[in-house]
Amino acid sequence: MSLIRTRLSQQVTQSPLQTVHHPLLTANKVSLSIKRDDLIHPTISGNKWRKLKYNLLHAEAQGIQQLLSFGGAYSNHIHALAAAAHLFNFKATGIIRGEAHYATNPTLSQAQAWGMQLQFVDRKTYRLKAQQDFLTQLTLEHPNTYIIPEGGTNALAILGVEEVVEELSLQMPQPIDHLFTATGSAGTLSGLISGAIKHSPNTKVHGIAVLKKAEYLKQVIPELVPNAESINWQLHTQFHEGGYGKVSAKLAEFCQQFTTHTQIPIEPIYTGKMLFALWQMIEQGEFAQGTNIVAVHTGGLQGLAGLKEQQKF
């Protein structure tokens, strides 16, 4: 039997669905539940686990022993990949955008503790990460290696994220009107769209872009989900709070107050930014009374240590 499937059954759980109680929701007569993907696994959580699952199974089935991927110095994906490689007995290499001194930060220190080898490259080189010539060279330098794209987004990742909606269709007693996620590379958003097509076609799927100038993702999504237009979905590009990794004072305050009120830990880069956007939409009366909303907690809590180190949060 597959080592990965055996350990999955032992260690990885279906994430719970938690109802949120808040005066804003009561006043506007809307309901909100959070899909707690941050609780899937202690170290490989959230959308990063969803994206990795079928990539890891594919690598195992092919007899491949090493994984390689790309990320920034505080990357949730790199952290999750290192943890997964350690858990499932792969070797792992991370191609890291930035200088070698980042190796001592909380994210990369832990990745190395799990056995990941780091290779630092400058921004110009890093931009080649999707170019075939560059990937071919990496394959020559790292034989018997399975290369996973930055952020983990590919066709196998979409299959993993689809399972969020499949689980929700069994967990929710009533139909979901709106399903929200943060989005960076559009992988999680695309997976939710694909999952909704299969399991919840009347749900509108929303992606809150966490980076500036994210309109290009509207072209990326149909490439990942060719039949995306068969359901209702929307990419919101106006809630980035200054760009990727930017944490405004209002966003930081919201995240802290939300965690205090709900006891649900969130970070301001992805889930916090998404919920802050959702809160503004509710305040503006964008949802009819009786609307049923689900938001996906995509994890990323390991990044809090790095944010504190950078004095951003």
Where are the regions a protein language model picked out?
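PLP-dependent amino-acid enzyme catalytic core
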Residues: 1-313
